From Swiss-Prot:
Residues 1-22 form the signal peptide. The lineage of its organism: Bacteria, Pseudomonadati, Pseudomonadota, Gammaproteobacteria, Pseudomonadales. Belongs to the thioredoxin family. DsbA subfamily. One of its GO terms (molecular function) is disulfide oxidoreductase activity. Disulfide bonds join C57-C60. It is found in: Periplasm. Keywords: Disulfide bond, Periplasm, Redox-active center, Signal. Gene3D superfamilies: Glutaredoxin (3.40.30.10). Residues 23-154 form the Thioredoxin domain. Involved in disulfide-bond formation. Acts by transferring its disulfide bond to other proteins. One of its GO terms (cellular component) is periplasmic space. The gene is dsbA. This is Thiol:disulfide interchange protein DsbA. It comes from Pseudomonas syringae pv. tomato (strain ATCC BAA-871 / DC3000). PANTHER family: THIOL:DISULFIDE INTERCHANGE PROTEIN DSBA (PTHR35891:SF2).
Amino acid sequence: MRNLIISAALVAASLFGMSAQAAEPIESGKQYVELTSAVPVAVPGKIEVIELFWYGCPHCYAFEPTINPWVEKLPSDVNFVRIPAMFGGPWDAHGQLFITLDTMGVEHKVHAAVFEAIQKGGKRLTDKNDMADFVATQGVNKDDFLKTFDSFAVKGKIAQYKELAKKYEVTGVPTMIVNGKYRFDLGSAGGPEKTLQVADQLIDKERAAAKAAK
């Protein structure tokens, strides 16, 4: 019985330690940085969380199994946005691919397959015709894809996202932005799970600030 009590106490202590670790306070300049100038959010009244990524980034691909379940559980006052980082070359090609799929309303159906094809399938997907052939295997109309790919709507989004990346002072991926004010990444946060812990605490910080301002 004594051993059982000790075991239970150890388990409780362990759980408490994990909880305390999860709730460890974050500091500006350590786990995250405050942007020089705040960037307006897309949906006023909601806390915006942005992930900047690149299909050619293995760290972004490895982050997917961690961030996707987290996104699914976000409360209704949080608006999550995925934005492709575009620094030229294949970054721009993959960014245009993502934006095209998003504009067509099929990004959520094809996103994982594109990542898998580039990271594990050996596909480059930097040519629009190769892209069209691939997304067609995922049920996307090839002609509609090519038409949308060169549309003014997509070109406008490309310009918008490139400008946002500059304002966010992004130099690598995956990078996260909370409410247009705070920037952090896997390195500064300490890994995938801790990255989301930082995001959670910054979301709470912004929620509390909004409540206090009312």
